Amino acid sequence: MAKLRVALLSAAHLAMDMTTVAFVYVLIGVREFGALSEAGGAAWYSPHSAAAIAACVLAYDLLAFGLQPFVGAFVDLKKRAAPLLYASLFGAGLCAAVCVPCDFPQGIGAASAAILVFFSLCNAVFHVSAGAFVIAESEKKCAPLGVFVSLGAVGVALGRLYAPAVLFAAGACCAACAAGALFLKTNDQALAPHFERIGRAEVKENVGLAPLALLVFAVFVRGLGGAAMPSGYAADELYVLLAAICTAAGKAAGGFLADAFGTKSVALICLPVSACLMLFANGIPALYLAGLALFNTSMPVTLWLSFAAMPRMRNTAFGVMACFLMLGSVFAMSVSVPGWLAFALVLISGAAIAAAPHVSKNKPEISENMPRPRKARKEEGKDV
């Protein structure tokens, strides 16, 4: 049941991101993406000014990601997530179902801005409330986190590329996922044992400022460095889809790799190799995409390590990591970062992730070196 729930919530992640991003692109009026311009790049067609487009995208990012720490704190304090999960999924689905037949929005105005805020709120609430159920399955393993966060990238790409066509279908998928979650008994009773365990667990510090600062720094510079990495070819439709698939594969693999080889291995091997591929092989699509996959293996790792930094406020930690990743990516769009600096930032990010467990008084469950022998794991199971 738990594995099915994680898989369903991952699919819901795809549907939610596709719905909200599709609305953003319908709102800003991008008519076509992927057509080659005279310069050989992607052609964008919009009746709105660049400032208006930037304001809409920035507002969405700040609300959808910036509110997650506050939603996470609410979930941690109230120890409830199911009502938020269903409200966000059904809310986004219903709003999309109303917008499409009404041919809305027609432009950027007060009403469309209000709907944008609503979709952003749904996105923020969904990520944390759905994440709460995945976090409950990630007390001693990182893999569920990787599976959950992986498909969001695919949803963003589909919403970005096919905004007018997929809005209604994406909203319907949100509602369908909510119905499926009801069938799988995704309720607050399922979370109660998790909250009880972390509530009575002995911890040396409720908030580890040193590891939290390292992880916040790591996700910020990773977002900054990753967004600034050069790409030596046109961002056409096929590439956007392939990049999303590789991103999803990397995030999913990162959790399993951390469980098998330790979080330090992912940080100190995958990130440096990814930086080399993305910088020095950026003109070769296959190698660049491989680097992109390796680059994203660290995402579930940083999330999982943040739970040791805030052991009783894990949903808050989840939101904090998401918020600072967004801030790094947004900052990268506002400044010019040379390739060598982006390369260095990715390496620094890996070092910060690897260092975080060593300055934390609350040690993570996953081995930092190599997995335990299978025989030892079987003997542990017999003792239980």
Q: Which residue ranges define each predicted feature?
A:
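Intracellular juxtamembrane helix-capping segments at the cytosolic ends
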Residues: 124-138, 296-311
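Central cavity-lining transmembrane alpha-helices of secondary-active solute carriers
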Residues: 54-73, 241-253
